[in-house]
Amino acid sequence: MPRAYETMLIVRPDLSDEPLEQLLSSQEAILRENGVTHVEITNRGKRRFAGFEMKKFKEGLYIQFNYEAEPNAVAAWEKNLRINESVLRHMTLRVG
């Protein structure tokens, strides 16, 4: 039975609009290929990190994904996120 998840991505702040849209659409396509439904993507904007750097960046662009998925689909997507150069960090939570 699918469960509700929320994944927050922190992506490189130097991505322009077109590469960012390509990144988001490719990530949504990967989710849908794994049987994920009800995908909502919210751009939370650029934020400065609190006194530290991530891969030499002092700020990042926060993108929130809300979706319903099976646990194995989430694991497959997270594997893809770990190797993506544009994603600085990510975290997934099960909600509900």
Swiss-Prot record:
UniProt GO cellular component terms: cytoplasm; ribonucleoprotein complex; ribosome
tRNA processing as UniProt keyword: no
Transmembrane intervals: none
GO aspect biological process, one term: translation
InterPro entries (alphabetical): Ribosomal_bS6, Ribosomal_bS6_sf, Ribosomal_S6_plastid/chlpt, Transl_elong_EF1B/ribsomal_bS6
SUPFAM superfamilies: Ribosomal protein S6 (SSF54995)
UniProt family annotation: Belongs to the bacterial ribosomal protein bS6 family.
Described purpose of this protein according to its UniProt entry: Binds together with bS18 to 16S ribosomal RNA.
Cross-referenced NCBIfam families: S6
Protein name: Small ribosomal subunit protein bS6
Gene: rpsF
